[in-house]
Amino acid sequence: MAKKKCVLAYSGGLDTSVAIHWIKENYDADVVALAVDVGANDKDLEFIRQKALSIGAVKSYVYDARKEFAYDFILPTLQANACYESKYYLSAALSRPLIAKLLVQIAEEEGADFVAHGCTGKGNDQVRFEVSVAALNPNLQVLAPVREWGWSREEEIDYAQKHGIPVPVGKENPFSIDVNLWGRSCEAGVLEDPWAEAPEEAFEWTVNPKDAPDEPEYVEIGFEQGVPVSLNGEALDLVTLIERLHAIAGRHGVGRIDHVENRLVGIKSREVYEMPAAAVLTLAHKELETITLPRELHHFKLGLEQKYAELVYNGLWFHPLKEALDAFIKKSQETVTGTVRVRLFKGSAFCVGRTSPYTLYSYDLATYDKADKFDHKAAKGFIDIFGLPTKVYAAVQKSKA
C-alpha cells in the first residue's frame, strides 16, 4: 500500500519544523513542505526550503505569492474599504486563504491525503485555514499538529532536540509576530495586559509619532477604477507601491494600531498592528469614492463594508456571500479614477485634496457665491413632498390624542 502524504504550510519556525517529524512519526506519512512568500522580506526562502528537506520533508516547495497576494487578496479588500471593527485592515487574515489555496493546489498535484498547518487551537488562523481548505476541496483532511500535541514551549524544544531538529538560538522574542506585504501584527508578552502601553520594541515599521519629522510630507496617490496605480506621479505596480508607501508613511508614525478585538473563537485579544500603507491607501480610496460614487451607491456600499471585513476576518474568503459582494464592489469601482493628496504628519494621515475626471462634485451647484446655479426655489416643493409622510403621520397622531 502506498504511503500517505501530507502537504504542510511551512514557515521555517520551530512549530512547523517539529511538525514535519511529528507528522511522519504519528501519521506514518511523507511530508511535502510548502513555504509561501506573502511579503515577509526578512525570510530567506531557499534556506527555508533546504531546512525542510534536512529535517525530513520528501519535497520542499517555495512560492513567491506577493503579486497574487497584492492583486487578488489585498486589492479587493482595499476596494471594499474593509476594516474589522473599524481598526484592523486584515493583514494576517488575508494571507491565510491564499496559503490554503496553494496548499490545496500542491496537495492535488501531489495526490496527498492531508494538508497541515501550524496554528494553535486558540486563534482565528486555524479556522481560516481549515474553512478555506473545506471550501476548495472538501475531501482533503486537515491536520493541526500544534493543536493536537498541546505541548508547552519547553516540551516542544525537548522534542526538537531529541530528534535533531534545529532550535532557535539566542534570546527569544517576547512577542508573537506575523508579517506580510499588507502589515505587521504583534501580540503576547506585555501586550496581554490591555492597560499596559505597548513598548517601542513592539514596533518595527513605524517611528514613534513624537519622533517623526517636524514638517509634514504630502503624497499623491493615483487610482484607475479603484486600483492604486501611481505614487507621486510615478506609475508603479501594486507590490512596489505598497512597499514604498509603508516606508514613507512609517517614518511619519502613520499606521500604528492598538486593538482589543473580538476573535471568532469567542475571546478578546489585544493586538498591535503596523499598517502604514493600508491606512493611507484606505483613506485615499474612501475619499476618492466620496466624489465619484452617486449617493445611493455610496451609502449602500458603506453598509456592506463592515460585513465584508467580518467575512474575511472569520475565514470566509471563499464563501458565496463574499464572492457576491466582490461582484458588487467590482461594479462600484468603474468610475473610481483620479488622484488623492494626503498629508502625513506626526502619526496622522489627512486627506487635503481629491480630483477625478468622473467627479460628481459640481462647483456651480455647491458654491454660495454669485456663480451658484442651484435652484433655491425648487427647495420648497421638494421639502413638501419629502416631508409629506411625516406630516400625515403627525396629523393622524394628533387627531387621536
Swiss-Prot record:
Gene Ontology CC annotations of this record: cytoplasm
One Gene Ontology term of the molecular function aspect: ATP binding
Catalytically driven reaction(s): L-citrulline + L-aspartate + ATP = 2-(N(omega)-L-arginino)succinate + AMP + diphosphate + H(+)
Keywords, ordered alphabetically: Amino-acid biosynthesis, Arginine biosynthesis, ATP-binding, Cytoplasm, Ligase, Nucleotide-binding
Species the sequence originates in: Symbiobacterium thermophilum (strain DSM 24528 / JCM 14929 / IAM 14863 / T)
Annotated L-citrulline binding sites: 88, 124, 128, 176, 185, 261, 273
Binding sites annotated in the UniProt record for ATP: 9-17, 118
The name this protein goes by in its record: Argininosuccinate synthase
Subunit structure: Homotetramer.
Example GO biological process: L-arginine biosynthetic process
CDD domains xref list: ASS
GN (gene name): argG
